[in-house]
Amino acid sequence: MKPSIVAKLEALQERHEEVLAHLGDADVIADQERFRALSREYAQLTDVTNCFKAWSAVQDDLKAAEIMLDDPEMREMAQEEIRDAKVRNEELEQQLQLLLLPKDPDDERNCFLEVRAGTGGDEAAIFAGDLFRMYSRYAESRRWKVEVISANDGEHGGYKEIIAKVSGEQVYGHLKFESGGHRVQRVPETESQGRIHTSACTVAVLPEIPDAELPEISPSDLRIDTFRSSGAGGQHVNTTDSAIRITHIPTGIVVECQDERSQHKNKAKAMSVLAARIRAAEVRKRQEAEASERRNLLGSGDRSDRNRTYNFPQGRVTDHRINLTLYRLDEVIEGKLDMLVQPIVNEYQADLLSALSEQD
């Protein structure tokens, strides 16, 4: 392992011990906010510290075994210990490299999931409904909560657009690579000739922004319109102007929310989505400015990217970003997404590891 990486690990181990000492300090214990922050840092450092201690112990074992090689009676046992230690050393180095990868602070957060019908008319809207159902099933399997913020129903089923908040553990970290273009190839129910049609949807996944990190939005930059809700809602539908449309004038970003009967609640939800979109636009702009020649798997989250093709006649789903094809579309569309999500995460980590290995 490179000396620079060892030095970095030694510094993290020292910090781990330092944080532990702080956690036993009476002043820190009395300051609950600082205590919680240090507790989180301690938890984050524990895995890498324990792994580094195990790696250091293996180095000691290797040195001891190499000394034993000089003793003819111990040589055979020493050679066996060296073989075992080298295998263990390689395993621990791989673990340490993964633990050293830069963490995306947004990975722990809830997210807003947006699915929009693209080209393909009614069939695209139906596919948008299928995608949202797929993500909802996936969320259910992970015990996440899905809360619809806004939905614009398609004329023959599905959605022209649907926005939902997904809450739970590591939500954004699992869903962020879903941002982009999704294409479906299948025979529509209304197709009498049996011809395969191609339709498309776009998916955007935005991390929820904590109140403390909300971008400053001047009221003068907003245009707020109210209108009457449409869709399900019983006797209260169309009786009050409870739906909200907020336009952020500088960026042209528009958010609607009509899910709640309370105008105040709709406005609060719409502002949360607006803040997430503004921040995402800022991040995208910064990523584009800092873009290097190195391939970036996630890209900027550009919705024109073609992520996947779902081919129903062949039961095939293809992720074009990593050239992965699975003939398990029936399982994927029912929400078993880990078989697609994990390979992308692995590829992304491999890119980061490659960059880490190029550092001094």
From Swiss-Prot:
Its main location: cytoplasm. It comes from the Bacteria. The modification N5-methylglutamine is found at residue 235. Signal peptide: none annotated. Disulfide bonds: none annotated. Pfam families: PCRF, RF-1. Residues 285-308 have a biased composition (Basic and acidic residues). One of its GO terms (cellular component) is cytoplasm. It is found in: Cytoplasm. Residues 285-313 are annotated as: Disordered. PROSITE patterns: RF_PROK_I. Belongs to the prokaryotic/mitochondrial release factor family. This is Peptide chain release factor 1. It comes from Photorhabdus laumondii subsp. laumondii (strain DSM 15139 / CIP 105565 / TT01). The gene is prfA.
